[in-house]
A protein has these predicted regions:
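C-terminal helix-cap and adjacent tail motif
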Residues: 9, 15-16, 176-211
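Short, surface-exposed beta-edge/turn micro-motifs
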Residues: 47-48, 99-102, 177
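Glycine-rich phosphate/pyrophosphate-binding beta-alpha loops
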Residues: 37-44
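Glycine/small-residue-rich phosphate/adenosyl-binding loop
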Residues: 52-132
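Short catalytic-loop micro-motif centered on adjacent basic/acidic residues
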Residues: 18-19, 49, 150-154
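Small-aliphatic-rich amphipathic alpha-helix that forms the alpha element of a beta-alpha
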Residues: 36, 103, 109, 118-166
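Short acidic N-proximal helix/loop "leader" segments that mark the beginning
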Residues: 1-34
Length: 211
């Protein structure tokens, strides 16, 4: 578990769909989550809950829901023109029940915030609480990268969210937001390929590119 320069982690972080069967140490999971909760969040309410899934039987159940809803939505047979990105996603869907570990990040909706006391503000509050989970997820992924672990941001389980909540005993006021498989990857980290930042950056007015 070596520390890594932040920019090195950011520039070499990748999404993985293939993992070695090696178990993920609890110490690594705990360190990742401890780093994740340092993220900024609305009103410092820290409206999150993490469910680390390491029991193979539970992984198989949750992964089975993921596989089922993904294939039902995208088709059980790959089309001849399926892109590499979708091929990777299909591979993960088929093998999600077998990944070494998973982490489910949830948003806890515990009522209106002091700044939004009325019932009409509830959608705003719920949105704020759910939005606070996304910086946490990125922290989690960067911590995993620093520890040599692979992750992938997925939300397909939401098509079968109640089934996942039933498996894991998640109460009604807790919303599942994203699920990541976790493991030592088959494949190499980075560099990632993206559009140049200058193509998506404006200064002072939309569309004003400064090179």
């Amino acid at each position: 578990m070596n520390d890594m320069n932040l920019f090195e982690a950011m520039y070499s972080q990748r999404s993985f769909t293939r993992f070695r069967p090696d178990p993920v140490p609890k110490e690594a999971i705990d360190k990742m989550i401890d780093a994740a909760i340092r993220a900024p969040n609305g009103g410092n309410r820290q409206p999150w809950e993490f469910i680390a899934i390491t029991d193979p039987e539970v992984i198989a159940q949750v992964g089975g829901v993921y596989k089922d809803v993904w294939l039902n939505a995208m088709g059980h047979e790959a089309p001849p023109d399926e892109t590499p990105a979708y091929k990777a996603a299909r591979y993960l869907a088929n093998h999600m029940p077998e990944v070494p570990a998973m982490i489910l990040i949830c948003a806890v909706h515990d009522g209106a915030a002091p700044t939004a006391p009325s019932s009409q503000d509830e959608p705003f509050v719920r949105g704020s609480q759910a939005s606070s989970v996304w910086p946490v997820a990125q922290n989690l992924f960067l911590a995993a990268r620093a520890l040599g672990l692979g992750t992938r941001l997925t939300t397909a389980h939401l098509r079968g969210e109640q089934r996942v909540k039933d498996i894991l005993g998640i109460p009604d006021h807790v919303e599942t937001v994203m699920l990541t498989p976790l493991g030592y990857p088959r494949g190499n980290f980075g560099p990632t390929q993206r559009k140049p930042a200058v193509e998506v950056t404006s200064y002072n007015r939309y569309g004003n590119r400064v090179t």
